[in-house]
Regions:
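Residue-level marker of alpha-helix boundaries and capping positions
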Residues: 94-98, 336
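A short, structure-level motif marking secondary-structure boundaries and short turns
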Residues: 88-91, 330-332
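C-terminal catalytic domains of large/alpha subunits in multi-subunit enzymes
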Residues: 1-55, 60-63, 106-373
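Residues that cap or initiate secondary-structure elements
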Residues: 68-70, 84, 94, 242, ...
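Thiamine diphosphate
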Residues: 99-106
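Conserved beta-alpha junction segments in alpha/beta enzyme cores
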Residues: 59-90, 97
Length: 373
């Protein structure tokens, strides 16, 4: 049976363990988009049935990716100043994943400012706790704290304007205005607006501030299963005599909720796919069972890919709206790329050789022992 057809036949419409509905699940579209881009329809069913011009065995495999949409706790402080500019303060840190690009985008949107009007302060413990960067939860957690802080300070600003008879927004109510371009606008009348600077000047204030917290919604978590999903398709080539394996192509399609910065997300996904390839073929922690110590704790013996090991990569992002996971609709992308890639590589090795890998990393000796050339 075709592996993709097998997965679709056994597709889970609800979370199998709890029976909860998914808050959103774009996995079917991930399968469809990834398979189309990869050319999966041309895959022969029988293993060991394809060779390239050099006589290498060629195999195609697919793996399903999933990772829980987690949130921790964070806090942020938002400021609107009398010159119309704003600031967002949060002690979030960036380890290279692009947080200091994505989080200011969320902040600018929350405050209704252009990026040039925003001062983003981060990276120090003097600021409100930004939560941990881990578990594919940082953007959702810190982002929601920023979103809530922005909403709170805009609500304060709106109260100043809508309760003042001198304001063109008088009587609109907080829910009747929206922040955009450094101004508050009436939702029902685009001709009536007032700048942040004018509102604060009339109130005699140099600035206003507010705080917001980011955390998971217990009611939503109780009602829904929240996951990011994806599908990874792999092509490998195997030397029929030496059983050396080389991954030549990886195509992944992922449904991860709202994408804040497409370029950063794609970079995260690429890193995850490379990590999955490394997990499948190279990485292994060797432990001395007498002492419990790791005995290959160095890059000479713990092998990871170099540039020459990385194949052609392609990551497709599926547009997914999730109204339940959080107010921003964000799911994490830090690890979803890892979870399907190793399985896809192992399945491609089976398709190329007829030998089913049962242990990672897949060693040459396992293929030599498992079947003839």
């Amino acid at each position: 049976m075709d592996p993709l057809a097998f997965r679709l036949t056994n597709y889970a419409e609800v979370e199998p363990i709890t029976g909860k509905p998914f808050s959103s699940k774009g996995l079917r579209e991930c399968y469809a988009r990834g398979a189309e881009r990869f050319g999966w329809s041309k895959r022969p069913l029988q293993p060991r049935s394809t060779r390239d011009d050099a006589g290498l065995l060629v195999g195609w495999g697919v793996g399903t990716a999933t990772f829980p949409a987690l949130m921790f706790q964070a806090e942020a402080r938002a400021v609107i100043r009398s010159d119309g500019s704003g600031a967002m303060e949060i002690g979030a840190h960036d380890m290279g994943q692009g947080a200091w690009t994505a989080l200011p985008q969320i902040a600018a949107d929350a405050l209704g400012l252009d990026m040039a009007q925003l001062e983003f302060k981060s990276g120090t413990s003097d600021l409100p706790d930004g939560g941990i960067a881990g578990g594919s939860a940082h953007t959702a957690t810190a982002g929601m704290a920023i979103h809530e802080a922005g909403a709170a300070v805009i609500a304060r600003l709106a109260e100043l304007a809508t309760s003042d008879q001198r304001s063109p927004l008088f009587g609109s109510g907080n829910a009747g205005v929206v922040a955009r371009g450094g101004r508050l606008w009436r939702r029902d009348d685009d001709t009536r607006s007032e700048s942040f600077a004018d509102i604060l000047a009339r109130a005699g204030l140099s600035q206003i501030d507010a705080r917001g917290k980011g955390a998971a919604d217990p009611a939503a978590q109780a009602a829904y299963a929240m996951h990011a999903h994806g599908a990874v398709f792999a092509e490998v080539k195997v030397d029929p005599d030496l059983c050396q394996v080389r991954v030549t192509r990886l195509v992944g399609a992922f449904a991860c909720g709202r994408v804040i910065n497409p370029r950063m997300v794609q970079s995260q996904i690429y890193g995850g796919m490379i990590w999955g390839l490394s997990f499948a073929l190279q990485e292994e922690a060797v432990v001395d069972h007498r002492s419990g110590r790791t005995i290959n704790a160095n890059l000479g013996e713990y092998h990871i890919p170099v540039n020459a090991d990385v194949p052609s990569l392609e990551a497709l992002m599926i547009d997914e709206h999730d109204p339940h996971v959080n107010a921003l609709g964000i799911k994490g992308v830090g690890e979803i790329g890892v979870t399907g890639s190793a399985g896809a590589v192992a399945n491609a090795i089976w398709h190329a050789t007829g030998v089913r890998p049962r242990r990672f990393p897949v060693r040459i000796e396992a293929l030599l022992d498992g079947g003839p050339t």
